[in-house]
């Protein structure tokens, strides 16, 4: 009788071990699956890069959901901005935002120059200048006369990152960290890049980046992983980030319902 009980106990323990092991395995599979979903979600967005001629977006449709009206073709919103703060200096940023309306086939936005100044009381103040622009023949054109020749030239030569960025090597990047918060939901993926990376070389070619430190690439998103017109996906190349110095480049492209509908 005792031997039968021992055999029964052993069988019960064996079943318990198998069950626990299976549960752990399931959790791991779920975790790996979510990580892959995050990577695929970003890859799908980044697959649009590059679009050398922004006017191609007039004929390109993005992700649509219930937020769009039937007769609304949607509006693309693109933004690129370089921010630099050297030790003991103010944070300066230069960039542009453009709304490409597929209904009206027009594109308008602003070239933005911003300086963040800290006063003697430690309070920060934003000094921002916005220069209205439109896009014609894949070029940004000021809508008002500009006296500042430096800014005028910057606008003439400006390209959004989506026009030259390329993420065909994304699957070969080695990630430092992938995170997901289902309650918000927000998710991100971080990669350490090399200075030989194509996108890093392109940024250095276009901007005077005062460091030789290779950046980290941070991809940040919110909303449904499968797609959402109310969510976002942002790209950030962080060269330096601390209390005294900050050098980073941000970029984003969204497809939203049009305000004129």
Swiss-Prot record:
Lipidation (N-palmitoyl cysteine): 23
Pfam families: DUF576 (PF04507)
Signal peptide coordinates: 1-22
Taxonomic superkingdom: Bacteria
Keywords: Cell membrane, Lipoprotein, Membrane, Palmitate, Signal
Protein family membership: Belongs to the staphylococcal tandem lipoprotein family.
Protein name from the UniProt record: Uncharacterized lipoprotein SAOUHSC_00404
């Amino acid at each position: 009788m005792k031997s039968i009980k021992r055999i029964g106990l052993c069988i019960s323990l064996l079943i318990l071990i198998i069950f626990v092991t299976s549960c752990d395995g399931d959790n791991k599979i779920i975790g790996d699956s979510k990580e892959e979903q995050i990577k695929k979600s970003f890859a799908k967005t980044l697959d649009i890069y590059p679009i050398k001629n922004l006017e191609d977006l007039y004929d390109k449709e993005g992700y649509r959901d219930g937020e769009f009206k039937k007769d609304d073709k949607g509006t693309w919103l693109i933004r690129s901005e370089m921010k630099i703060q050297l030790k003991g200096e103010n944070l300066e940023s230069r960039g542009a935002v453009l709304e490409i309306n597929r209904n009206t086939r027009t594109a308008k936005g602003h070239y933005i120059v911003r300086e963040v100044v800290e006063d003697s009381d430690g309070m920060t103040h934003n000094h921002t200048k916005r220069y209205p622009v439109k896009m014609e023949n894949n070029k940004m054109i000021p809508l008002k006369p500009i006296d500042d020749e430096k800014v005028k030239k910057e606008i003439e030569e400006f390209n959004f990152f989506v026009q030259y960025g390329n993420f065909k090597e994304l699957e070969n990047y080695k990630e430092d960290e992938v995170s997901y918060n289902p309650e918000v939901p927000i998710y991100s993926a971080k990669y350490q890049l090399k200075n030989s990376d194509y996108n890093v070389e392109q940024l250095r070619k276009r901007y005077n980046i005062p460091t030789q430190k290779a950046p980290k690439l941070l991809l940040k998103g919110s909303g449904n992983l499968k797609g959402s017109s109310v969510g976002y996906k942002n790209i950030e190349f962080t060269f330096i980030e601390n209390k005294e110095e900050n050098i980073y480049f941000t970029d984003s492209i969204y497809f939203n319902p049009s305000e004129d509908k």
